[in-house]
Amino acid sequence: MTPSEQNIDKEELAKFSDLAQDWWNPAGKMKPLHLINPVRLKYIEQQITLKGKHVLDVGCGGGLLSEALAKHGAIVTGVDMSESLIDVAKNHAEQQQLNINYQCQDIEILTKDAQRFDIITCMELLEHVPDPQRMIKNCAALIKPGGKLFFSTINRNFKAYLYTIVGAEYVFNLLPKGTHDYAQFIHPSELTQWAESGGLRLLDITGIHYHPLKNEFDLSRDVSVNYLACFTHE
């Protein structure tokens, strides 16, 4: 597969690759990801037991979620298109004595293999690829019947723009400026439609709410900004 055929935004890839060495610094540029990671794990564990499950973490970055899943008993494969992030993930997992199969790989290549997974996570990735529907379709092709797929992304509305771009990037400096492109945000209805066209069935959508005074995230019924969705393939 040539680079032009891959579902990759080269500018987005370079942007996150540049953050590789700061990925595991909880007080650094990836601080919001460190804060949100326990909430993502909490949501996944509400939907399915992790122990002994084969999990594919798509767009694993430096391995924050992959390590959390592994520590809770999952057998984890993490894939990302950034070599520098995969190197960081491998080195950190080795330091933690965790056995995680990290690959610098396009998910479309994985669909040609025989392995299928009990759980697939695709967190904070859909809004950073040129064709999110294609990404969802490839995830659907890799899940076992009855398996669970988890996506997290950002709703597209004025409130989400204010919170995630104006607030997070420019007012509170929680994220590097330019992290998000509003045009790439995704309505829950769009996500559901794309997933259903790939043979998936929606089980749950839950919001993620940021408490600025507590400086922490939690699950919420409000899906107007950040949200998580769980699907199954039957």
UniProtKB/Swiss-Prot annotation:
Q: What is this protein called?
A: Ubiquinone biosynthesis O-methyltransferase
Cite the annotated pathway: Cofactor biosynthesis; ubiquinone biosynthesis
Reported EC number(s) for this entry are 2.1.1.222, 2.1.1.64
Question: What GO molecular function annotation could you give as one example from this UniProt entry?
Answer: 2-polyprenyl-6-hydroxyphenol methylase activity
Q: What does this protein do?
A: O-methyltransferase that catalyzes the 2 O-methylation steps in the ubiquinone biosynthetic pathway.
InterPro entries assigned: SAM-dependent_MTases_sf, UbiG_MeTrfase
| Reaction equations catalysed | a 3-demethylubiquinol + S-adenosyl-L-methionine = a ubiquinol + S-adenosyl-L-homocysteine + H(+); a 3-(all-trans-polyprenyl)benzene-1,2-diol + S-adenosyl-L-methionine = a 2-methoxy-6-(all-trans-polyprenyl)phenol + S-adenosyl-L-homocysteine + H(+)
Where on this chain does S-adenosyl-L-methionine bind? R40, G59, D80, M123
Which CDD domains does the record associate with it? AdoMet_MTases
Which residue spans adopt a coiled-coil conformation according to this UniProt entry? Answer: none
Q: Describe the family membership recorded for this protein in Swiss-Prot or TrEMBL.
A: Belongs to the methyltransferase superfamily. UbiG/COQ3 family.
- Supply the alphabetized keyword list: Methyltransferase, S-adenosyl-L-methionine, Transferase, Ubiquinone biosynthesis
The processes (GO biological process) annotated in the record are: methylation
The coding gene here is: ubiG
Q: Which domain of life is it from?
A: Bacteria
